[in-house]
Amino acid sequence: MGQDLNLAFSISATSRPPRGTERDGVEYFFLTPEEFRQRIANGEFLEYEEVYKDRFYGTLKAQVEKQLEAGQNVVFDVDVHGGCRIKEFYGDRALSMFIQPPSVEELRRRLESRGTDTPEVIDDRIARAEYELTFAPKFDTIAVSYTHLRAHETRSNL
């Protein structure tokens, strides 16, 4: 990803078990719920979220600092709360981008066309998206995801 800009994704921590061929320190840092809670108590996370009971996801400060010290520009794929926390921590050193669908109706169409979720799950995801859309003004820039290719072009033009 982004050799000319030296972009690299952050590696998140999670308390869920590895799936398939996932490796610790590559796709995620895999922690037990107890280890995750201890690191929260120690202030080691830039941001974190308990998505379900004992199912945490978060970004470790030390990992991001290691990437920054290596000269990488770190890209985070986080929810709106995480994005706001990271921006608050790094201030002007961070560029926050909110990626949104062209409309809620288009998002619903995309979710339905996948054929992977029940109508109830889609309704829950739409409700979550509507909530998250209220955070868009807090971000430095907003990119509309018309298609994967156009979203990439928008990112490249920043």
Predicted regions and their residues:
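ATP-dependent small-molecule kinase phosphotransfer cores
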Residues: 14-74, 80-84
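Switch/connector loops and helix/strand junctions flanking conserved nucleotide-binding motifs
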Residues: 19-21, 84-86, 104-110
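Conserved AAA+ ATPase "sensor/coupling" helix adjacent to the nucleotide-binding pocket
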Residues: 45-46, 110-117
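Conserved catalytic network of the ASCE P-loop NTPase/AAA+ motor domain
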Residues: 66-69, 88-92, 134-136
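Conserved phosphate-donor/acceptor-positioning beta-strand/loop module used by diverse small-molecule
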Residues: 76-78, 90-111
